[in-house]
């Protein structure tokens, strides 16, 4: 099966030219009620304006008309990969972005710390955006409480604010599937979802995820704000063509958020 990336690989030639690509993730907004401007339209942006005056401008439809992509497919599309063919879950992006190596059969998942009220109702999906220090403290509690689940090794990593990463290791056993539903309901005022496997290979993963959620809530029961966890974006090790080989470009990245650390992205790519 071929796609545009195969054609680009055939046509690309190395040159001395340089490209600066600026990605403002999350800057989009809806018109304000006061004057109809978005936040970006209302802002004073002399530096962006000066950069735009020296740039080639355009618009891109990242996935399809009317589809708002998540960070994974959105960034893949920006860098020329078909996000419908090359699927990378948020868990893998988060894990690799902080330098965590994934092995065959492992599953990584992106976690949010959350605030749960009476009846396990989600009050805040980001637990008030705790400090990185508080994040590390909570991760330490979870590491002590959940080193493994029924013999399956569990690794927990701090990321930033409310974000953390969990890796379920296959440990030489049967590969864990990553095809299961999210725990994060993407809304407040409701309970967290129960993970449901969508295929046989993911049955064990769903059991591990649901057990982790229960144990995490027990470990955090004395916390007033960071007392729950929400999961989304399960991913095993993805593979896609090398950016260098496809475009004949040597890429470097400066990122303010660990998920996009280019230092580690080669681990997601095929030779």
At which residue positions do the language-model features occur?
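Active-site nucleophile/metal-coordination loop of metallo-enzymes that catalyze phosphate/sulfate
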Residues: 2-16, 28-143
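A contiguous, mid-domain pocket- or channel-lining segment that forms the substrate-recognition surface
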Residues: 90-215
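Acidic carboxylate-rich catalytic motifs and surrounding loops in phosphoryl-/glycosyl-chemistry enzymes
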Residues: 60-65, 154-161, 231-232
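Acidic, glycine-rich loop-and-beta core segments that form the ion-binding/anion-interacting portion
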Residues: 207-263
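Residue-level detector of conserved catalytic or cofactor/ligand-binding positions
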Residues: 263-271
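Structural signal for hydrophobic packing residues in well-ordered secondary-structure cores
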Residues: 12, 27, 52-55, 142-150, ...
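Beta-strand elements within well-structured catalytic alpha/beta cores of enzymes
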Residues: 17-30, 51, 218, 226-230, ...
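Active-site-proximal structural scaffolding
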Residues: 41-44, 159, 209, 256
């Amino acid at each position: 099966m071929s796609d545009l990336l195969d054609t680009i690989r055939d046509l690309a030639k190395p040159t001395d030219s340089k490209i600066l690509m600026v990605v403002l993730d999350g800057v989009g907004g809806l018109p304000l009620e006061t004057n109809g401007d978005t936040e970006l339209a209302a802002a004073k942006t002399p530096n962006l304006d000066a950069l735009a005056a020296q740039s080639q401008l355009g618009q891109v439809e990242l996935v399809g008309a009317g589809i708002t992509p998540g960070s994974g497919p959105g960034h893949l599309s920006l860098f020329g990969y078909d996000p419908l063919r090359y699927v990378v879950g948020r868990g893998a992006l988060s894990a690799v972005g902080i330098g965590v190596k994934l092995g065959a059969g492992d599953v990584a998942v992106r976690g949010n710390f959350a605030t749960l009220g009476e009846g396990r109702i989600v009050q805040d999906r980001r637990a008030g955006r705790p400090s990185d220090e508080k994040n590390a403290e909570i991760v330490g509690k979870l590491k002590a409480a959940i080193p493994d689940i029924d013999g399956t090794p569990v690794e927990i990593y701090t990321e930033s604010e409310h974000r953390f990463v969990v890796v379920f290791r296959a440990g030489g056993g049967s590969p864990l599937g990553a095809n299961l539903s999210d725990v994060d309901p993407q809304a407040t005022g409701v309970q967290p979802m129960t993970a449901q496997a969508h295929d046989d290979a993911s049955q064990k993963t769903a059991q591990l995820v649901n057990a982790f959620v229960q144990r995490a809530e027990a470990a955090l029961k004395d916390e007033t704000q960071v007392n729950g966890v929400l999961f989304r974006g399960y991913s095993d090790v993805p593979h896609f063509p090398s950016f260098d080989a496809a475009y004949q470009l040597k890429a470097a990245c400066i990122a303010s958020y660990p998920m996009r650390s280019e230092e580690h992205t080669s681990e997601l790519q095929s030779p």
